[in-house]
């Protein structure tokens, strides 16, 4: 039962109605018997109005998605080192009106991969795309044994700023980061030959933006024991993953990343762990973390 003592958490984004986050977090609150509820706030308010509302309404913590992951960065009181390097936030904790923000996307991705494929090691990784989610995955990669990342980035308005941010991540972590033009198929074929993992971090393959981010003929250059991952979780099997599976590669969709980043946000707010296996089982119809 919701009362005046119930702590409020939520997702702030637009659009947001489709989100699985309320199910995940409310399951977590039930697990630890915490008097709290997680709601969805589909908002197009200004960033300043968002931070003001969090403080004024006493919302204990929020997740952020588009369009707020970058625009709220300068408006919070504290940033974790991860958030500073990535330049984007997905989690805010409100402690008596003081907002501390972090980014759990990258660690969420690698945690999901570890759970689904515990014996695998990833020294060299190729990533398609260099948006906020990709930067988070790259920033976290070194903590999971990755030594080199090759990023394929379109030459658009964000190119220079992304290059600068990747240089900062490399300097801070020691991770070797190579950036290539997205449409350079020779460079892509070369990178794939040495990749333990190929990741799609573009929006190509989402329900609203169907397609395949990789020319099908290039997949042959990827070693047969490599893993192919997609950050997209809707649909669960993108054209990219279907192509990889047909070529007998192990695959990983973005659902695990969604669950694990949520669990890390939950811990950031509550200092309690979320049991993720029941959530995996519910959302996959009884299957495990893979």
UniProtKB/Swiss-Prot annotation:
Reaction(s) catalysed (UniProt annotation): shikimate + NADP(+) = 3-dehydroshikimate + NADPH + H(+)
Disulfide linkage: none
EC number: 1.1.1.25
Molecular functions (GO terms): NADP binding; shikimate 3-dehydrogenase (NADP+) activity
Family: Belongs to the shikimate dehydrogenase family.
Function noted in UniProt: Involved in the biosynthesis of the chorismate, which leads to the biosynthesis of aromatic amino acids. Catalyzes the reversible NADPH linked reduction of 3-dehydroshikimate (DHSA) to yield shikimate (SA).
Protein name as annotated: Shikimate dehydrogenase (NADP(+))
Organism: Latilactobacillus sakei subsp. sakei (strain 23K) (Lactobacillus sakei subsp. sakei)
Gene: aroE
């Amino acid at each position: 039962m919701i009362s005046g003592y119930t702590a409020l958490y939520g997702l702030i984004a637009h659009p947001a109605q489709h989100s699985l986050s309320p199910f995940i977090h409310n399951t977590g609150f039930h697990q630890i018997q915490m008097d709290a509820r997680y709601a969805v706030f589909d908002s197009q308010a200004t960033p300043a109005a968002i931070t003001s509302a969090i403080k004024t309404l006493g919302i204990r913590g929020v997740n952020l998605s588009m369009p707020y992951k970058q625009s709220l960065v300068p408006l919070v009181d504290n940033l974790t080192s991860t958030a500073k390097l990535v330049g984007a936030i997905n989690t805010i904790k409100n402690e008596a009106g003081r907002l501390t923000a972090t980014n759990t996307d990258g660690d969420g991705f690698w945690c999901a991969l570890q759970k689904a494929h515990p014996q695998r090691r990833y020294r060299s990784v190729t990533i398609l795309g260099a948006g906020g989610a990709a930067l988070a995955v790259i920033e976290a990669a070194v903590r999971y044994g990755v030594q080199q990342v090759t990023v394929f980035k379109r030459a658009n308005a964000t190119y220079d700023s992304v290059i600068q941010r990747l240089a900062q991540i490399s300097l801070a972590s020691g991770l070797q980061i190579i950036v290539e033009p997205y449409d350079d198929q020779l460079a892509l074929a070369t990178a794939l030959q040495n990749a333990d993992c190929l990741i799609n971090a573009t929006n190509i393959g989402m329900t609203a933006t169907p397609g395949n981010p990789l020319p099908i003929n290039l997949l042959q250059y990827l070693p047969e024991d490599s893993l192919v991952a997609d950050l997209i979780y809707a649909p669960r099997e993108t054209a990219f993953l279907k192509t990889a599976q047909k070529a007998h590669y192990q695959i990983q969709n973005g659902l695990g990343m969604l669950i694990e980043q949520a669990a890390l946000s939950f811990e950031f707010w509550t200092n309690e762990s979320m049991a993720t296996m029941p959530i995996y089982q519910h959302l996959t119809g009884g299957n495990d973390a893979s």
